[in-house]
Amino acid sequence: MADTEAPVAPAEPAGPSPYEEKAPYYAKRIELFEKYFEREGTKVEEAKTTNEPIKVVMPDGAIKEGVKFVTSPWDIAMGIHKKLAQGSLLAHVDGADWDMRRPLEGDCSLKLFGFDDPEGKELYWHSSAHVLGEALELEYGADLTIGPSIEEGFYYDCFLGDRTLSATETEGIQKRMEKICKEKQPFQRIEVSRSEALEMFQENKFKVELISNLPEEATISCYRCGPMVDLCRGPHLPDTAWIKTVAVNQCSRAHWRADVTKEPLVRVYAVTFPDKKLMAEYKLRIEEAKKRDHRLIGLQQELFFFHTLSPGSCFFLPQGAKVYNKLMEFMREKYWEYEYDEVITPNVYNFDLWKTSGHAAHYKENMFSFDVEKAEFGLKPMNCPGHCVMFGNRKRSFRELPMRLADFGVLHRNEFSGALHGLTRVRRFQQDDAHIFCRQDQMEKELAAFVKMLDEVYEVFGLTYEMKLSTRPEGYLGELETWNKAEAALENALNGTGKEWKLNPGDGAFYGPKIDITVFDALKRRFQCATVQLDFQLPIRFNLSYVSEANEPERPIIIHRAILGSVERMFAILTEHFAGKWPFWLSPRQVMIVPVSELSRDYAHEVRTVLRKEGFYCEVDDSDRKMQKKVREAQLEQWNYILVVGEGEKTNRTVNIRTRDNVVHGEHKLEEGLLETLLRERKIKSLTCLFGVEKSAAAAAEKAAAEAAAKALEEASISKE
């Protein structure tokens, strides 16, 4: 008898998908884009008829010939070498960003950037963000908001109404992006008026808000790839086929304008690369970064934790406090060396202070404020206003300058709860914050000393860094002559380091130029920690002055500077940089002593007493576990040195040394061998074990001496002959 199936009830007619609901809007948007694109094309075709020759100056001074509104950066690159064109993603035309396929409009200078350049990566990932935006529209009918490139990759924020995206849906988004890339969709550019842009994006309230905030007379550029059209100043890749590999990493929640009272958004993160090898390397780095996550290591090593009773404020446990205090102690050593004076200032100030400093007008939403006896007070988010009060407390003489005030005061900033992230984004923190009050003629020397101090500190941690000089912006305040002198002083300080640095024109603060310092950890990730900023405005706001040599009142200049930045943030960076394997001088677990048996337990505690007297963190594992188990546990807990002591070591007053990486350094005298080496390792803040260095150095010296003796003997024999 044939199998029969139960009758299936007819399915309810499915409603239109979110994309189908938006399809008429998307179609209208494309129709308008094509209309304006045709208008652009007509202009270009008319301009081409002049056939006017142009000269293009390359970075090496070479001059290339071209035709106005015909020749593009791509054509110039192809004329030099095909590989140059294939590797060039972005052009700078007279310093301005330019699409590789966009025709040049006159005589100009030209510089090309590839994926290896930060500028090239930024463009590559920004173009990829448009592909992600297209995928989100096609898959979910999303209302797109903003989609920038970030440090490593990009994201797009979109509005899905009540819908959210789960981690399992990233695969579908990724497949859609891969399909778009294979379609080789060209990136097309148009320029429209404000009213035309409003018409084009009329059904996306987020884009309408962005457009409405622009001036009435603004010219707005838009880009299209496939059916997706977006507001964008560009430039972009020639087409989507330049994107070879895609990985959609995660979805998270966000809010429009980063305001929790506004519409909830879905943020989708992704990354792309021009070849599979780079993607494989990226995934390896991500896996390694997960293992090094400071939040994970913080729990494993019992360094710190967070609690819902005080979000964004860290509880440092005893082991974590040891590291934290060592960092502070290190900076205090440098302050002494560079003749800073440490001060202690209040945590709470009347809001009159913040009105004077300008924080009340520009920073209040990031401050914790409260009423005290009908007056408004605020927890300090930074130290500079308090230091200004300290400087202005009495009349100052030119002889007192430079005045270097250092402060480890506790700071509070009211970060959004959604932005809090381990130790890297907190509400309560401390900084190695200092302010230098100086004369104009002292600026250069003070800046040079700061950069030298910065280099010495980062070298101790094994951190590399890069520096950028950010010069005056368009809306700068103060005298041009003062700015010129300040920028020259910063430039001279940078040149004095002998290191390469970059110019970042127009990116200084309105109140003074600065050096932006980016640090790189062991995984080559970038972090902003240190800062040095000249300030001409705060002394004016607080009416600060000193009596000059001519017995006249003069305005000081303030240098804001920090090296660690937030101690909490640096703690997180170093945790991940060292992968929890703290160098001996910074380690909260320096020495574990393991007695072989009950007979050597007393000697183990004697060794501990000797080491503790010198300030070393050490413990004795006198549990009844087997010795091998004790050693293994100590290694897993990242004790730098494990000292095994038995009857022989007790008799000889020695210790048997091994490291957490199970490198055995053998038997050493307690005082002459162990203690002397540990003291030296701590003093020089070595990143490596000195026992191995000593042993190899001694062996090398012994070998060299033997070779020298053999050579001398040989020479003596020859002379006798």
Can you say where each PLM-predicted feature lies in the sequence?
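NTP/phosphate- and nucleic-acid-binding module
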Residues: 1-145, 149-151, 155-721
